[in-house]
Amino acid sequence: MYLSYIKVENYKGIEAIETEFDPKLNIIIGENGCGKSAIIDAIRLLYNVGEPIREISVSSDDFHQKTVDNGGVKTIQKSSLITITYIFKGLSTAQKGAFYEYMVIDPNKIEEDYAKVSISYEEKDGKYPNFSYNTGNIDGQKADYKTFELFQHYYLGALRDSTKDLLSTRNNILGKVIRRFVKREKSESEIEQIIKDANSQLLSRDEVKNTRDGVNTNLESIFKKVIDNKIGVRIEEAKTEYIVNAIKPYLPHDRSTLTDEGFHLWQNSLGLNNLIYIAVVLGDIKEQIKDNGLPHFALLIEEPESHLHPQLQLSLYNFLNNANATENSQLFITTHSPTLTSKVPLKNLILLDCGKATKLDKQFQNRESEKLIEDTTKNKELLDPDLENRMKKLQRYIDVTKSQLLFAKSILFIEGISEELLISAFTLLEDYKLEDYRTEIVNVKGTSFYPFLYLFNHSNQVERINKPISIITDDDRFTDSKKSEYSFDSLINDTTVLDLLDDSIQKGIAVSRIKNLNSVKNNADNIQIFESFKTLEYEIALHNVNDDRRNFKNNFLVQYLDVVEGVKISKIVAYMAKFPTDLMTDEQRRKVAILLWKTFPTKAEFAQDFSIHLLDNLEDAKASFMVPKYILNALTHLKNGL
């Protein structure tokens, strides 16, 4: 049995969100304020209904509020009804019997039977919210209230104190596990007798008897012979419940025998104590399921990365993924951790964004009707197995850095490190940083943008993750320009070769990638493709050649190259001196730009050194350096789309 679906309406910051869940592990991600904790609390509300002491309730402050614009006058509109609907699937025959008043039956497909429950809170006349519930598919049907006891959960909040919980003298989690073993073995009387025997030995000690006799001597002096008033001494609470709560975990120095002296948990790190607590909880769930196969257990953990370094986060994930193999138990985790997110399969990730929840694997399922084409030369439509393959590729591509795209407001996809270094510097020329707009720059280290795009290109806007996306790529026309016959020396020494190269670039055909990307874009207006004419470096050179040859050296880029490649810059100046006028034609500018482009060091070296030079001389760069227009357009799309 597992929680398969939830719909939350008008609860806290959520107006309406619905999502499906994985039977075992669910990682809920998203930026701050998107509703992750509200989803967890919505689950907790159901699992608290059957508890004698509820750890969570609904107050007037929990009803959703939103701003409404009425002709320029803004007012706050507060809802008066919270409704949360839960659907459970995978019930055993015994569970279907226990939850019979919850069941929605499909007579044709028994395997499609499911349990349904809705809870609601209504606020009237400012009074405390009125709780109500409905089970099954019939209005007004209410299962026996005691059935709510079959929904069991453990909750570890973001600001939890696991150390305190582990060392509590009442109802501590380790004591619960031990008590369960004791009950199963029917050994309560044996354990209580052990304590009674120990108590008898303790009470027979001279230190205890002398203390008792001293008190009685004083009482005799007070009462004389009027009242015979003496005390005895005993140790209270020899019950198993109190005995096991006195058993506390510690960290023994000898890890082989696990006995004798050791460190107190207060001396341990918060992160490691959190792990101990989680291990104990999972042990308790496993033992409870052995005793009773009817309840459903939910373990809800907020921000498990708290106090854990990245490697230990991954160890925790691997442990949780493997340890939660028990039927009838389910994990729900919220996280901001890119480390954790990068290792979790997409089927276990639920992204909260723009007021909706998206189970990420759904972006790669049941999309054949959209007739997606990735290779426009073959014009072959993608089938569901093709999309599943793209999902597997994406899971391999997403590392700690790339997983940050899921938490961003907008995303800039680029080909490589050169673009990453330069564009980060270019934004500073426009007086902002990418992080100011919560934009994530994703270096795909090549041109394999496609697997990422399927997250954001659904034809149905309701299903789409509607983040603004810009893709910056080269159109890579006339790739022969890399050959040695088009080196700087060849071009400057024989202008006919320069003329040929310019003509070849102008008449060159963009690679099919541009058409392919626009095809995969799938008419989604949140995605825009911005291609360079030729390459980024060619565009940088072209944008920084002034129309007037007299101003050639007044440009920030040219001045930089004059320092590192002074001889070549002098040759370009000599080449321009042959022009009949100071104002250059478009063709002359292009040829000068080609020569300037050919003075660049290697691609990576230029990006590394020039980006540093830009950052060190921002004010000078702002005065004369021109950022290629297609780059600015890509950045503008990301800002305007927010």
Residue map of PLM features:
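Extended helical coiled-coil dimerization/tether regions that scaffold
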Residues: D165-T169, K176-L299
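Conserved catalytic network of the ASCE P-loop NTPase/AAA+ motor domain
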Residues: E31, T75-S79, I110-E112, K146-L150, ...
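Conserved P-loop NTP-binding catalytic core
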Residues: D41-N108
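Acidic, divalent-metal-binding catalytic cores of TOPRIM
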Residues: G355-L642
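Short glycine-/polar-rich loops that comprise or flank the Walker A/P-loop
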Residues: S80-I84, D113-V117, E149-H153, P345-N348, ...
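Switch/communication elements of ASCE P-loop NTPase nucleotide-binding domains
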Residues: M1-N48, P252-T401, E420, L615-L642
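Electropositive, glycine-dotted interaction segments
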Residues: T83, K89-E190
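Flexible phosphate/Mg2+-sensing switch loops adjacent to catalytic phosphate-binding sites
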Residues: N48-T75, E287-L294, E327, F332, ...
